Amino acid sequence: FANINNKSALIRDQVFFDLASISAGAIPEEPMEAIKHSALLHQYAAQLDAYKPTGNVSMEDLCAPIPHPRNSYGVGLNYQLHIEEAASKTPSVPMVFTKFPSCISAPTSDVIMRSDECDYEGELVIVIGEGGKNIPKDNAWSHVLGFCVGQDFSDRGVQYKDQPAQFNLGKSFDTFGPIGPYLVSIDSFTDPSDLSITTKV
């Protein structure tokens, strides 16, 4: 799934299919509305051979696949190497913080550095599709719409200016949450709990 110039699309190889067009309007054009139709998305993804591609994929046209999430949570100290780098202890429960949804930006957009104390962290982004409360652990994956990758930018000067640390503020400035380039469904992976990501500068 992709957001191409603010229109929902499916990607295969280097071409895209406009979802509103191939579904005759059954799937909305607006990406945040389109993702509410998970079953239809999978249906059309399975039968793309029946449709003519809308065009070629251009990285410059790709917007954040989930441009306006209702919530945006992060989990701190979620990599062992990062825990060691920070000379911290492994938390007994996940250390959850928020990144304001207003920080979400396109995968190739510029990041506005506010100071020379800005830092980056490559992250796996998990997009929740079907909502719910008190979801049993065994059913958790059924609520995941898909994955993409993102950068968790932080202004460490703001974040650690005083104690307690201001995680939410330091990580939520405009452009500090680029994500994308596509949203990949979990059934594309043999084991969605065993994935690797790489960050290059």
Please place each PLM-identified region on the residue numbering.
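Glycine-enriched loop-and-adjacent helix/strand subsegments that border the catalytic/binding cleft
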Residues: C63, P69-V201
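N-terminal non-catalytic cap/leader segment that marks the start of a structured domain
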Residues: F1-P94, S188-T190
